[in-house]
């Protein structure tokens, strides 16, 4: 048997073991503490130490490192830097399994933190329940399923007696769900490889890019007044309904988004970037016109639109200029211009389809998962920093991302095992078997 056949045979024989590995990882809560209602769950450290032992037993050289905002101050204007985040009991885990030499190295990466459980679960979110071929638990899809799959792929190669020329490296990080400072710290610590796979859930599709995400709050001022009475002209002190002014601006964003359908599209994304309003808060009393309206929006941006710091500064200005242009067409808004408070800027990244690593991964995908396609992540992942330091990086992992953050999050066992085999094949090809 060749290497791939040996690995697949081992995995077929040890499928129950690899499933139990994921279930045990799901039983260890690792909720990001910035979701306050879950702060008592001991954060990510216990899960990282469980994985560390698994790697140690395979022969990895491992270490735990704790991100520190003060030590990362030089990155304060760049992606992932969150000065108020603390990392007690929140380590990154890094490990390397040395090859025999003269081969290319590969980093396998994922985030160990998960979001809060929320309500309406019918399975214990930290049980790892296995029912009808599905494994349930918070993080099953996002993204302990991917972490378990990439780690099990290395174990299958190791247990099959195969030696590699290149090093295999594992980097599991914290804080992806609340800013991305874990990956910033991992990269700043100097960890590098010739290529990287982030095993975010892609349904086994190959995602060579992810989009950046901007959250902003659009604030529109009005002037309160009795809602049941006739209004005087605003120039004479009459009331101005902030909700009316918000609607005026919202209508203009239809034109904005139509333009973005062409200027913010990408061949590997199923939908273009758009600016969508998600929350609305206005007014103080039922009997008064709203004196202020606040609208929170989500806007996406492409890697090609990043600014010099790897963030969405250019797109922020584009949005601000558009709002200013709309305001200039309304007398009240011209004198009382709306403003935007920026809440979040999550970075993005892209690996060209001309890169050798993309071609190797695509070949393995076609051989192992013929129905899979090349399709970028519409949401944010941690790939930006790896790309920033010159590491060709792709997202490829098991599970349907639409199930992430939901009650009864689950991953299908069949797809999980299929992903392990696929990642193992990529490792064998990229890091090269010895003769």
Kindly give the residue locations of the regions a language model identified.
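Acidic/His- and Gly-rich active-site-bordering loop/insert found
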Residues: 2-135, 164, 400
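Fold-level recognition of mixed alpha/beta catalytic cores in primary-metabolism enzymes, strongest
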Residues: 132-135, 140-255, 405-421
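Hydrophobic/aromatic beta-strand patches that form the interior of the parallel beta-sheet core
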Residues: 63, 106-108, 171, 195-197, ...
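Short, solvent-exposed loop/turn segments at the edges of secondary structure
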Residues: 90, 123, 192, 211-215, ...
